Amino acid sequence: MHPSTMRCMHLRPVTMHPTSRMLCWKRRLRPKGVRSPEAIRGRIQGTWRQKTVDLPAGTEICCFPSLPKAPICSTSTLMRLRSKTNAKRADFTETFESSTHGEAPAEWTTIDADGDGQGWLCLSSGQLDWLTAHGGTNVVSSFSWNGMALNPDNYLISKDVTGATKVKYYYAVNDGFPGDHYAVMISKTGTNAGDFTVVFEETPNGINKGGARFGLSTEADGAKPQSVWIERTVDLPAGTKYVAFRHYNCSDLNYILLDDIQFTMGGSPTPTDYTYTVYRDGTKIKEGLTETTFEEDGVATGNHEYCVEVKYTAGVSPKKCVNVTVNSTQFNPVKNLKAQPDGGDVVLKWEAPSAKKTEGSREVKRIGDGLFVTIEPANDVRANEAKVVLAADNVWGDNTGYQFLLDADHNTFGSVIPATGPLFTGTASSDLYSANFEYLIPANADPVVTTQNIIVTGQGEVVIPGGVYDYCITNPEPASGKMWIAGDGGNQPARYDDFTFEAGKKYTFTMRRAGMGDGTDMEVEDDSPASYTYTVYRDGTKIKEGLTETTYRDAGLSAQSHEYCVEVKYTAGVSPKVCVDYIPDGVEDVTVQKPHTLTVVGKTITVSWQGEAMIYDMNGRRLAAGRNTVVYTAQGGYYAVMVVVDGKSYVEETRYQVNLSWTRRLCADTSKHRSVIVSEYESVARPPFKEVGRLRFYAYYSNILLKQFVPKSCMKRLSYYLPHCKKGSFLRFPRSSTVITVCQFSWLEYLPVTQGVAGSSPVHTAKIRSCVEIVFRHSSIFVCYRSTGKYNYRMRLFNMLGKNFLRTKQKCLSLLRSAWDIGIKLVLFQEGRYMESPGQSDEERRTTIDFYGNGRYLLFRHSELLVENGYQVKAVVTMLGTKPMGRGHKVSPSMVKLYAQELGLPILQPDNLNEESFLDELRTYQPHLQIVVAFRMLPRSVWQMPPMGTINLHGSLLPMYRGAAPIQPRDTPWRYGKRELPPSASGMR
């Protein structure tokens, strides 16, 4: 305890004797009585006098003996000093007004570590006409140029400031020569240079570069190079004893000035004077707390009221309460659970739970003066991860906020991230962030100065792998059109080259105003990872727990159907289960090498193998059969070849035609609607889409799937479970993440184009009088469009993963094993990739798409399904706006533009599609495919650009009911009593 100073007003019946003295004890005395006031009646009061006595540390009781030879203290002369000695020390401000111009400041210690004889000096505005003090006339200064270049390393050290919690000061530099670097340092021991550590440092930036420099002997001649005074406040860690200002790491600039340094002193009653008691829902759950934090695990989900009261010796304070909602979803589940056969085993694979906490799961509330309550769920950050938090509270007062950009490759500083100045001015490339920064706060941050994807008030966070990063904190300002990078007015720079984020740590960057600019204060906390394990269930029974790996093998069960579930067990609770149905199909993947050879030479189809083979046409008629070798001369069209070896089925589809036309035999009323070019099938053991660069459409009768392999009784039983789909049946075949839906319709009602695009399936959407097969990419959703009224279409979603349905119908499902093999051939892009040489990476094989659209036709979710199913939509092209509408005759953006803005997709709005500027920008995206819905006519230069062609989707078969978007909820072909206009698709090469 620091020695305290006591000021006493001494009142006694007689004047205090000059030799009287104060006696103090460090032990507590208990008075046993009080003298009667009558004892002093009739006495004459002496003169009031003031005395100041320094007390040693630990003093509790003082005595005032009044007689020179009577050291025994009466009880009336005892004073208890507990409250005084623990009281807060008075704040104080150093103005340097008592110091002399040209000399070291009084009551401060200076160290000239560089030894050039020029350290911190007091300057007076009365002596230098270029100087303006912040308050009064005096300041303290250190120079990096004073008639010649200097390399300063100067310390300005305060007196003992034990108990200080903050230091506020003002500084100024030469506005034309900024960059005089300085640091605020603290020492908990002594005043040697090696005793100090940095708590804050910065390099000031000026506005006007160049001009005159000034020293102790320089005449101003009317010039005022000094910058405005900038205020800084720095928090001091507990135990701080001395504070130093160090001027260093700069040369040949000019000076730095300090003035009005104010220390805020701490101090509070000792912890033993009061404690905290915590209540939940009116029940006392913890008392006797001396810390200002409390954690409780295993709290039941729902709403709870937490209250805190302070218990003093003489009583208790009123309770301060806060409502807290505990949400079970804060325990994140696993992601992307899959069940696949491997030999005779079932292998489960999944991804670790998301490291990002549930939105709003952390709550900080002020519930009284100086009292905060923080509610945060169990930690879910892995051992190799760090958490970065960006917090702000409307720093500028104008609702402009901040973004945090992190580059995991740490190679953008000095190029993308400038060393000084804004990130960019005006308009930046739409992929500036996606191409250079792997992690963003907020996650949808975009490089637009008018963006609303910012942190204004509140906080955002991201979990990153521990390691080295380049980062910057941006502040978009619409008024100036600049993407500013925040200033360095805090304890951590807002831009950094090669900063190390340690795993297991939580880094909180809090934005604040700093003088005329802003800055960030960084706080680092230990955020050690929570321990969690995985539990696996089969058909509702726990079969394995305590797993730490993201895979599990269930031996010997690949021939049976089961439901598998995985849950995450945290210290504080468990996550919801994630489940998947496993159904054996016994069919090899089409990409696996098959034990047979299939060749097509001219019109001759030859199959060689060791087993039985059959060749079918698309009407289900068997054309040829045999063992070991089958040869068939084709008459034209498509053919299915089925090979059975060791009880396993392999199916290939083949054809010999180069050009495929859509005829009346396949699709009604489509003779005027020409198809696209189809390349010749040349593969032996690959699907029939070997070559890249040609868009293929497949449309054919699939009676073979029903007549040859599925009994009518089975189809009827399946139809019973799907009453919503008119005269149809839906089956699921889980292979990877592709779903095949087999529908039987007497008349196909409004088969949606959406499935053909988003599912990457053959786009056969014309009216078909028999049966059609549609291949989806999504693994758990079935989509069926049907007419539920005279004018209304509705989309119904069927999740057919229910275990009861699959178990009771697995015999019917097994009958369609070969149907699966035929169907898999129709997937244009399997799993979002197209087939090419095996040497390329997955990223290189990703199919990229440009989307064109404008009208309400997109209510059928063409664009949404493209994005949600993982396709890389590189850009969206839409019109500038609709015609003026409403009272204000305002031009509204198209629905496509609004949706693209929501997703953060690049938007192109050309006036003229033939403009070179538009074509050049379009080429930069290098799309593999273009999809056009409800848009204007495209010139050849546009639709020929993608290597895989352009798909143009219509709401009806042209030319009848033509128009950009003829299909609207209020305006359908059914309105006119006609049924001949299902949607259509065309391909352009």
Curated annotation (Swiss-Prot):
EC number, as in UniProt: 3.4.22.-
Stored InterPro entries: Cleaved_adhesin, Formyl_transf_N, Formyl_transf_N_sf, Ig-like_fold, Pept_C25_gingipain_C
UniProtKB keywords: Cytoplasmic vesicle, Hydrolase, Protease, Repeat, Thiol protease, Virulence
Region (Disordered): 969-989
Single Gene Ontology MF annotation: methionyl-tRNA formyltransferase activity
Cellular localisation: Cytoplasmic vesicle
Gene Ontology biological-process annotations: proteolysis
Protease is among the record's keywords: yes
Sequence repeat boundaries on the chain: 270-323, 528-581
Main location per the UniProt record: cytoplasm
A GO CC annotation given for this chain: cytoplasmic vesicle
Purpose of the protein: Cleaves human complement component C3. May enable P.gingivalis to evade complement-mediated killing during the immune response. Plays an important role in soft tissue infections and is a virulence factor.
Record family assignment: Belongs to the peptidase C25 family.
Cited NCBIfam families: choice_anch_J
Entry protein name: Protease PrtH
High-level lineage: Bacteria, Pseudomonadati, Bacteroidota, Bacteroidia, Bacteroidales
Gene from which this protein is expressed: prtH
